[in-house]
From Swiss-Prot:
Keywords: ATP-binding, Ligase, Magnesium, Manganese, Metal-binding, Nucleotide-binding, Purine biosynthesis
Residues that hold Mg(2+) according to the record: 268, 281
Protein name (record): 5-formaminoimidazole-4-carboxamide-1-(beta)-D-ribofuranosyl 5'-monophosphate synthetase
Origin superkingdom: Archaea
Similarity comment: family membership: Belongs to the phosphohexose mutase family.
Functional description taken from the UniProt entry: Catalyzes the ATP- and formate-dependent formylation of 5-aminoimidazole-4-carboxamide-1-beta-d-ribofuranosyl 5'-monophosphate (AICAR) to 5-formaminoimidazole-4-carboxamide-1-beta-d-ribofuranosyl 5'-monophosphate (FAICAR) in the absence of folates.
Matches recorded under PROSITE patterns: ATP_GRASP
UniProt cofactor(s): Mg(2+); Mn(2+)
SUPFAM superfamilies: Glutathione synthetase ATP-binding domain-like, PreATP-grasp domain
GO biological process: 'de novo' IMP biosynthetic process
Pathway: Purine metabolism; IMP biosynthesis via de novo pathway; 5-formamido-1-(5-phospho-D-ribosyl)imidazole-4-carboxamide from 5-amino-1-(5-phospho-D-ribosyl)imidazole-4-carboxamide (formate route): step 1/1
Organism per entry: Pyrobaculum calidifontis (strain DSM 21063 / JCM 11548 / VA1)
Annotated positions binding ATP: 141-187, 209
PANTHER family: 5-FORMAMINOIMIDAZOLE-4-CARBOXAMIDE-1-(BETA)-D-RIBOFURANOSYL 5'-MONOPHOSPHATE SYNTHETASE (PTHR38147:SF2), 5-FORMAMINOIMIDAZOLE-4-CARBOXAMIDE-1-(BETA)-D-RIBOFURANOSYL 5'-MONOPHOSPHATE SYNTHETASE-RELATED (PTHR38147)
Length: 333
């Protein structure tokens, strides 16, 4: 439990996040549930000030996020991490920030390392692509992925070992070489609820990526930079498997990372034509794909609450219920 959380006035809680990624969804949901809201901006602060559901917009230097976190504690703030926070602030600062942070904070360390990611998925018993540490080990077509939450930037595909050996020389920084799995992509949104003691399927999406999804006519190299997301509803026959993977992943986090999942997370997959699902990635926090149902609610939320709810509202609902039951320490680290 966060030491700061013990000192909080539960009647005056605020919800805060970095002004990017899913901030609008998170803060809109928090305001609808009666919380004060704070957006912390590195840039584009004026854009966020136009929205009445954001009570305060701060500008900050993310190179010293500890100072920001200490100010948030003074405001009784609960912090919601997302992909931009992980990328801009970095997992080391995120681990040390003294503000109460939603979810398993230690998972951010695992999320920053592609090999540890694959280790955790394997521990969950979830089917994954083969992966390689050296180009000379690779077989068949592969995708090369950089470490960190980069939204697909810098990824590339190589058709064979020879092409890979040539192109890998230009890669700077840490990377993983994964088997390229043929099929369609699908990204699953889950919510781990300590309040209701369950893992919920909350939605799914497809990423819209350049130049893979662009009109390139074969003239440019495929790239995987994410520019947006598209909603997806799966065949119902696939839902039991998807849910099981989410439950198994939460169990693996408990056993391998020694902390409980709380709040949103995501498994990223390819579905083959034989309907098997291969998971190649996870995100241990809210993903931008949840923005596809902001304001209208996930089609799956009605299965649990009999009313539409987006992920920002789902987070706020969990916080409110946990505060009322005196179990906020199960959500925040």
């Amino acid at each position: 439990m966060s030491a700061a959380l013990k000192r909080y006035d539960l009647d005056k809680l605020a919800v805060a996040t970095v002004a990017s990624h899913t901030a609008l969804q998170i803060l809109r949901g928090a305001k609808r549930y009666g919380f004060r809201t704070i957006a912390v901006a590195q840039r584009n602060a004026d854009f966020y000030r136009q929205f009445s559901f954001i009570d305060e917009v701060w500008t900050a230097d993310f190179s010293n996020f500890r100072h920001v976190a200490e100010k948030l504690v003074e405001k009784n703030a609960l912090f919601i991490p997302h992909g931009s926070y992980v990328e801009y602030v970095g997992w080391r600062q995120a681990l040390e920030a003294p503000v109460p942070t939603l979810g398993c904070r230690e998972l951010l360390r695992w999320e920053a390392d592609q090999y540890k990611k694959m280790e955790l998925l394997a521990a969950a018993g979830i089917p994954t692509p083969r992966y390689y540490k050296r180009a000379e080990e690779a077989e068949g077509p592969v995708i090369v992925k950089l470490f960190g939450a980069k939204g697909g930037r810098g990824y590339f595909v190589a058709k064979n070992r020879e092409e890979l050996a040539k192109r890998i020389k230009a890669v700077e920084g840490d990377y993983i070489i994964q088997e390229y799995v043929f099929g369609v992509p699908a990204y699953y949104h889950y919510f781990a609820s300590p309040v209701y003691n369950r893992v919920e399927i909350f939605g799914m999406d497809i990423r819209y990526e350049t130049n893979v999804d662009g009109r390139t006519f074969g003239w440019v190299e495929p790239t995987f930079v994410v520019v947006g997301n598209l909603p997806l509803v799966l065949r119902e026959s696939l839902l039991p498997v998807v849910h099981k993977y989410g439950v198994d992943f939460a169990k693996a986090v408990r056993e391998k990372v020694s902390c409980e999942l709380a709040g949103p997370y995501c498994l990223e997959s390819i579905i083959r034509d034989d309907m098997t699902i291969v998971v190649f990635e996870f995100s241990g926090r809210i993903v931008a794909g949840t923005n596809v149902y902001m304001g209208v609610g996930s089609p799956y939320s009605v299965l649990y609450f009999d009313e539409p709810m987006d992920m920002g509202e789902r987070i706020a609902h969990e916080i409110k219920e946990a505060a009322a039951r005196g179990i906020l320490e199960k959500l925040f680290t």
